Amino acid sequence: MELLLNPSLFSLLPLLLFIIFLFKRLYTSPTCQRKLPPSPPKLPVIGNLHQVGSLPHRSLRSLSQKYGPLMLLHFGSVPVLVASSAEAACEIMKSHDIVFSTRPKSNISDKLTYGSKDIAFSPYGEYWRRVRSICVNHLLSNQRVKSFRHVIEEETKKMIENINERCVSSSSPVNLSDFTLTLTNSIICTIAFGRKHCDVENMRKIKAMLMGFEEILSVFDAGDYIPWLAWVNRFTGLDAKLKTLAKQGDELVEGVIDAHMKRKKAEAQSYDAADQAKGTDFMDILLDIYQGTVPGFALDRDSVKAIILDMFTAGTDTIYTSIDWTIAELLRHPRVLKKLHTEVRQVAQGKSEITEEDLGKMEYLKVVIKETLRLHPPIPLLLPRESTQEISIMGYHILAGTQVIVNAWAIGRDPLYWENPEEFRPERFMGSDMDFRGFNFEYTPFGAGRRSCPALAFAIAVVELTIAKLVQRFDFALPDEAKPEDLDMTEASGTTVHKQLPIVVNVVATRN
């Protein structure tokens, strides 16, 4: 007792407290003193990977309903911020867009696109700004999209004729998904390579390549999240498959480049406004830039190949998936299909073809597509971004190097923004100025900000004309007298979320 009351010990107390303070400052991470977003418990090594599931957009929504619209997960050793509200999406894709404009490094995209030299996966910087500018100003400008209008019209006309022939030759149900996939491949191939390169053999190669790319882009690469496990790719076969697919894509595109270069040399073509008016294909435009005939722009050969492959993988998947889900929702909702039938056939009455002017008058068609993309955004989890610096979002501290995922699917079904969000009701968009351009963060099926989809106008042009022509020329019914609600709407897993089963229907050509 006397020892405890010794005055000399009291004199040491301030020194002791100072030592404790220094110890805490030295051995406590600064981030622990800052407010981080809420997180579910994680496991050693894998973090929260076990909670992702085969349909991540659904499992992440379930987690966000418990942990909030901005939550922090850990995929292996990588911190991953998940945004599941319009407010959080706005913070990331608008308020702090520049901080979140780069992409995380990906082994798969590096291998398939020559070190991520494409538009989708290229890190933010001078190179990305250059290729994005080429895409926006030369490949997918409004003028360019209009110049490809004849390709879209010709290919959709071919599809209608092929479906007609199939109906005449057989009364069995038609796999409509096969026809729309072939249509999308043909359109992309024609505008990318030119019609002469879209023969049966090349189309077969392209289809096989796209299937391989789609499958592998959805594969989990352990090395991206747990670096010391990268070696397992050799044993799982991922490295070998990547090498095969990269070679397959390279050989296909190199063959087309060589053919274009020979033709251009023979014809001594030069890049000018007249070429644009003729509707030059993407490869011609990119090779002109590669050869230095377009002032202010430059590309190497690998960049040309990466951008072209990007057009195929992103363009085909996005358009085909949007068409497929739109048809599925129409079959599930006969009232909506009947209303759309009426509009399309009234506007195009007495016409064999639907013009751009006709499409402009089809308001219900436009809201049907908008509603489909609300419920079924082609890429439900927008391609991941990465923070380039420490930043505060919605009161939470976010570290530099944090991956960021915006769950566009969850936001499009949030009852906070949408009345009866699970209901397919196109009328909710009537009279609304909400569109696809990424200005309304409760609705971003094609992303927003610097990383929004540059092919938006082109994709919507193809989807609109395809749906309008199918509805104009045919009546559809589910086989075996199945009820609309019996149509299987199960999703397939993947970066782009397709309908798992193809759309198979009875088709009857209408009198026009």
From Swiss-Prot:
CDD domains with a match to the protein in the record: CYP71-like
UniProt-listed Pfam families: p450 (PF00067)
Keywords assigned: Heme, Iron, Membrane, Metal-binding, Monooxygenase, Oxidoreductase, Transmembrane, Transmembrane helix
Bilayer topology annotation: Single-pass membrane protein
Coarse class of the protein's main subcellular location: membrane
Pathway annotation from the record: Alkaloid biosynthesis
One biological process term in Gene Ontology: alkaloid biosynthetic process
Domain of life: Eukaryota
Transmembrane segments: 3-23
The protein's Enzyme Commission number: 1.14.14.188
Catalyses which reaction(s): norfluorocurarine + reduced [NADPH--hemoprotein reductase] + O2 = 18-hydroxynorfluorocurarine + oxidized [NADPH--hemoprotein reductase] + H2O + H(+)
Classification via Gene3D superfamilies: Cytochrome P450
Record family assignment: Belongs to the cytochrome P450 family.
Protein name: Norfluorocurarine oxidase
Species name: Strychnos sp
Gene: NO
